[in-house]
Amino acid sequence: MSKIIGIDLGTTYSAIAQLDDLGNPEVLSSTDENRKITASTIYVGVEKVIVGDKALDALAATPKNVISETKRQMENDVKYSTEKGEWVEKDEAEENCYTPAQVSSFILSKLKGYTSEVQKAVITVPALFAEKARIATLDAAKMAGIEVIELINEPTAAACYYASLPNVEKITGKILVFDLGGGTFDVTLCNVIDQKVDVITSRGDKWLGGKDFDKEILDLIDKKYKKETGKNLDLSQGKLQYLEFAEKIKRSLSVKSKHAEVVEGPAGPKKIEITRSEFEQSIQMHIEKLKMLLEECIDGSGHEAKEINHTLLVGGSTRIPIISKTIEKVMGKPPLKGVNVDEAVAAGAAVYAGLKSKTSLNTAQKKAIGKVQLKDVCNFYMGTLVQRDDPVLNRKIIENMVVIERDTKLPAEETTSVYTLYDDQHAIDCSITQSEGRESNREFVNLIHQGDLEFPDKKPKGREIQVTYKYDTSGVIHCTFKDVSSNKKYEISLRPESAEDLKKQYETIEHIVIE
């Protein structure tokens, strides 16, 4: 068995996988649930946490203690308050509050319990996951007692799985991975030749997925209920319950043309029918966004749709018929089907975990994963804020300067220089920016770190500061700002929180029993 396992930590569902004795990726299931994917929903009690579908049983009695869609909060400085039943700013948080990393650690601990051998893992994240979200994922794993060997982008993991299949020769060439899950969307174009996966570019939206479709269905239900009864549903009290109800309807409409269900509300129970056509119309705005991002990915690659050999579907939301129809309209041919879209990402993470632990694999496992190789890219523009003279405005302005270009192969290292603008300048700003566009306006970039490099002496303007960025294969940045004249450095390594900070977070949850 593989000593390193693969984990798909999802918005709606999560999964854990490893290579079996023959080298095939095997998605593991819990002993108490008859399914291989685990709902990323948790119930938090005083001394007990329930992870998975059983957490939903607490919705009626204690809805404020049920947490879902945690993945969407990973980059935010928030905590979930069981007193308020919502995410609140970190500085507002009091007792009975949990960070996104803590909540995710509960899910990881549950998955870890599916096998006794988990100590190290490859964990998947969305391609467009921001720096803070990646670091929070590493924090969550550490609290769950898992050493992360590498973070891998979800569509890349799926491509890695496809590359390992015995019939891989049938899907070689330019492959588009269309990954639409419960909370996030990624579309990645890559070359797959002789089991080598070479990512070209990715686009996506970390706030676009099946959960957004559920909300549109809920809005439909509410409107129909009001039309029939004159009253709206009470969404302030039972929104999560209604959303679970909406998800059930969405699943049904993926295979049926209409679905009728009795809806409980303030005016009593009422039978509501929703057709597939109504559903598709309600999510049209989201479909247009998916189409736009798909076209952006193709355009950004420098290729045309007709040059792409295959489109692979990943993520449970790709089962919705209009998704395949939209892809076919853009690509000129239908996407490939036949692989379990819920398990492909976890399976790919297991294959990559096998690549990372080849020395511990048996002969059959080594033969099964064959010559699979992986080369990913930086999905953001990584830069720094610099001050310069603007001859038009006749004043100094601050703007963003790109250091590492988007789609640069990983691991990446780039060095550039910036210069002081004043005589006797005592310090320079050391900032790190991240953006999806090549923006110079600082208002349109995400500032992920800010500090100062103080100079040991005074010099005329034009003092050179060497800026070096290193971006690792997990998508985590390391930066150095060096004053060339004195060799004084300001170094930044955006890694998980300090051991002391993590210890404090862990101490608040270590007594909790996870079921």
Residue ranges and their predicted role:
Residues 1-76, 97, 115-515:
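Oxyanion-binding/catalytic loops of NTP- or PPi-dependent enzymes
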Residues 84-96, 271-272:
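Short, conserved non-catalytic motifs in the polymerase core
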